[in-house]
């Protein structure tokens, strides 16, 4: 499953700009809602996300529209349910009819400078420069994204701006499950005694559809965790939380 955690900042240094404030839109990839210390989770520490939550509004009844990256992002930037506009799987191209209606285009037409850095995945990993209303200010990479955004913020802007910072992590937990190297540096292997326990609903659901079990058995790339032991899952959870902390540090920059 994939979730997107989103954080939006409205900032203005001049009273006259209140009607059209500068907007910084930060989102992370595959971060479940409980993976923040401000959500009461004792297994990780996210001071920067906590600070954003404390300074704004923390929604506890919001849902991701799709479990896959591309469809979820498609909904976010078009306002449509993914299956309503043909964005049901990763790799689905954005329909030409929607390109003039995307969030970036609409905000640009409202008089904003719009910039995008990081992961796009609709379907290209990076947003095409000057398309969808955005100037592409940084590639699909967490390394250097914060610095690129800081440089953008330091510029003298003649218009209000809308800046999107799209982080990949904690998506790298997929690489961990597949025993692959992480793109932005590996996480040290923990002692099992330092790993969090398992949730109360850890046991396999006896009512799962047969197709789910079939996918687990026959599609390793989708379900590389099929053979995980309880100890493997505890180490997985430990690593996942360290990846969340890693992206929290990037946001703090």
Task: Report the location of each language-model feature.
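Sec-dependent signal peptide recognition
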Residues: 1-8
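Hydrophobic h-region of N-terminal signal peptides that target proteins for export
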Residues: 8-16
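Active-site-proximal cap/lid insertion segments
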Residues: 18, 30-35, 39-41, 155-159, ...
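Active-site-proximal N-terminal segment of extracellular/periplasmic enzymes that hydrolyze or transfer
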Residues: 18-57, 66, 176
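Short beta-strand segments
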Residues: 27-28, 61-63, 162-169
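Active-site nucleophile/metal-coordination loop of metallo-enzymes that catalyze phosphate/sulfate
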Residues: 54-57, 61-90
């Amino acid at each position: 499953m994939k979730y997107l955690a989103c954080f939006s900042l409205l900032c203005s240094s001049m009273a006259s700009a209140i009607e059209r404030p500068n907007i910084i839109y930060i989102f992370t990839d595959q971060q479940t809602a409980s993976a923040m210390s401000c959500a009461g989770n004792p297994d990780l520490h996210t001071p920067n996300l906590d600070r954003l939550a404390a300074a704004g509004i923390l929604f506890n009844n919001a849902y991701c529209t799709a479990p896959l990256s591309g469809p979820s992002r498609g909904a976010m930037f078009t306002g449509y349910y993914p299956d309503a506009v043909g964005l049901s799987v990763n790799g689905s191209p954005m329909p030409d009819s929607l390109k003039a209606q995307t969030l970036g285009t609409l905000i640009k037409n409202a008089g904003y400078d719009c910039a995008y850095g990081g992961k796009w995945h609709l379907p290209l990993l990076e947003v095409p420069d000057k398309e969808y209303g955005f100037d592409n200010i940084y590639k699909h990479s967490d390394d250097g994204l914060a610095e690129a955004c800081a440089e953008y913020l330091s510029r003298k802007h003649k218009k209000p701006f809308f800046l999107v910072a799209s982080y990949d992590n904690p998506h790298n937990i997929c690489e961990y499950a597949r025993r692959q190297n992480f793109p932005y540096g590996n996480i040290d292997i923990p002692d099992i005694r330092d790993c969090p326990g398992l949730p109360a609903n850890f046991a396999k659901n006896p009512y799962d559809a047969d197709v789910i079990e079939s996918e687990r058995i026959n599609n390793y790339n989708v379900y590389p965790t099929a053979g995980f032991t309880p100890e493997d899952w505890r180490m997985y959870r430990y690593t996942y939380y360290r990846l969340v902390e890693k992206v929290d540090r990037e946001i703090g920059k």
